[in-house]
């Protein structure tokens, strides 16, 4: 019985091999035909792709980098939205500075006509080499964005903001004229046009957006972003940034505490939350982010108001400890290295975890409330 079955199995395997060989040959022919018609790289096996892992751009905040899985993904569309004065433009200026530090080229499409070059320079932006456009209409702005992307010479384009991309029909019309859905149609057409070019050029495009309230919403969240739904679908990452606290020394306000929720992420787990300080005139407090992570990973320990490192007290209160880190760059580098090692080993902190951690809760409870005036901030 077993001897009779062997030739049958051999015949079946031969037929399968022959059929798979024919399929492979047909596949090679059709792939070759597609590449001749549409160019090299128009179709490929995913395993043959030169870049399997998505490269990232640092946001300037270590906690937000963790929440995003490394930073802003390159070659993708990103939307940053939130209320006024919540830190949207500051986030993008830090991204521009990071791109320029690495030898890249960045462009800022200033549809709001509100870019402050002095503030941008204080955040590390090379304003002399930053490409800036202040378009008159939404069509002009998006056409400029498309041409910059097509050039493959620009690494990052920031559009500030979608709400300010006014359609030509609205500008040329009379005040009070209704052009229902004009901006949404404009954004929908633009996203269809530029998305394919973004993938080919590797350019990252960050759209800043404002919030509006839906009329007649009794239950649920009445907030929505401007420009229709196209950007929501095409964006690989959507960040919701909010101002949750005003930082004070005595009665003097010197910054804000911002909370960013990753509302959408196609390249890493979404719905993570990151918090960081934004200092007026200075931007994101990188040392503040480092101290928060050092506290959560127990590289720096805290008892009451005192922070200690290797058993030695280094500062009373958060502000004094940040000042100590500024004044001791060698110790700061060692602490940063230890924090990154712990995070690489898989340590969970509030920015890379979906569940609230005890250290994060302790940290939140120790911060002054909005109405509270603190001598240490």
Curated annotation (Swiss-Prot):
InterPro entries: AAA+_ATPase, DNA_recomb/repair_RecA, DNA_recomb/repair_RecA_CS, P-loop_NTPase, RecA-like_C, RecA-like_N, RecA_ATP-bd, RecA_C_sf. One of its GO terms (biological process) is DNA repair. Transmembrane segments: none annotated. GO terms for molecular function: ATP binding; ATP hydrolysis activity; ATP-dependent DNA damage sensor activity; damaged DNA binding; single-stranded DNA binding. Signal peptide: none annotated. GO terms for cellular component: cytosol. PROSITE patterns: RECA_1, RECA_2, RECA_3. Keywords: ATP-binding, Cytoplasm, DNA damage, DNA recombination, DNA repair, DNA-binding, Nucleotide-binding, SOS response. The keyword Nucleotide-binding applies. It comes from the Bacteria. Its main location: cytoplasm. Residues 1-13, 362-377 have a biased composition (Polar residues). ATP binds at residues 82-89. It is found in: Cytoplasm. Residues 1-20, 346-377 are annotated as: Disordered. Can catalyze the hydrolysis of ATP in the presence of single-stranded DNA, the ATP-dependent uptake of single-stranded DNA by duplex DNA, and the ATP-dependent hybridization of homologous single-stranded DNAs. It interacts with LexA causing its activation and leading to its autocatalytic cleavage. Belongs to the RecA family. PANTHER family: MITOCHONDRIAL DNA REPAIR PROTEIN RECA HOMOLOG-RELATED (PTHR45900:SF1), RECA (PTHR45900). This is Protein RecA. It comes from Prochlorococcus marinus (strain NATL1A).
């Amino acid at each position: 019985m077993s001897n009779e079955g062997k030739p049958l199995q051999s015949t079946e395997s031969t037929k399968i091999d022959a059929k798979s060989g024919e399929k492979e040959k047909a596949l090679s022919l059709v792939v070759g035909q597609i590449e001749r018609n549409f160019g090299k790289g128009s179709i490929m096996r995913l395993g043959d792709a030169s870049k399997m892992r998505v490269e990232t751009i640092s946001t300037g905040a270590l906690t937000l980098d963790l929440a995003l899985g490394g930073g802003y993904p390159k070659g993708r569309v990103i939307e940053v939205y939130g209320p006024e004065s919540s830190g949207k433009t500051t986030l993008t200026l830090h991204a521009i500075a990071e791109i320029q530090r690495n030898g890249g080229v960045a462009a800022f499409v200033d549809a709001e006509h509100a870019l402050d070059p002095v503030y941008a320079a204080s955040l590390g932006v090379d304003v002399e080499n930053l490409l800036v456009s202040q378009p008159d209409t939404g069509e002009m702005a998006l056409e400029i964005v498309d041409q910059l992307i097509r050039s493959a010479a620009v690494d990052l384009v920031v559009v500030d903001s979608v709400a300010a991309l006014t359609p030509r029909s609205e500008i040329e019309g009379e005040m009070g004229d209704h052009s229902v859905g004009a901006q949404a149609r404009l954004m929908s057409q633009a996203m269809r046009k530029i998305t394919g070019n973004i993938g080919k050029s590797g350019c990252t495009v960050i759209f800043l957006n404002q919030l509006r309230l839906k009329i007649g919403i009794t239950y649920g969240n009445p907030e929505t972003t401007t420009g229709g739904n196209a950007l929501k679908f095409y964006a690989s990452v959507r960040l919701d940034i909010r101002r949750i606290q005003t930082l004070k020394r005595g009665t003097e306000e010197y910054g804000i505490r911002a909370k960013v929720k990753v509302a959408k992420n196609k390249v890493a787990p979404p719905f993570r939350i990151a918090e960081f300080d934004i200092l007026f005139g200075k931007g994101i407090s990188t040392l503040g982010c480092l101290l928060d992570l050092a506290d959560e990973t127990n590289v720096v320990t805290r008892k009451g108001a005192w922070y200690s490192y290797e058993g030695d007290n280094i500062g009373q209160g958060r502000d004094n400890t940040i000042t100590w880190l500024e004044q001791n760059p060698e110790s700061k580098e060692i602490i940063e290295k230890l924090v990154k090692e712990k995070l690489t080993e898989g340590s969970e902190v509030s920015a890379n975890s979906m569940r609230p951690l005890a250290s994060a809760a302790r940290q939140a409870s120790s911060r002054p409330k909005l109405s509270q005036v603190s001598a240490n901030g």
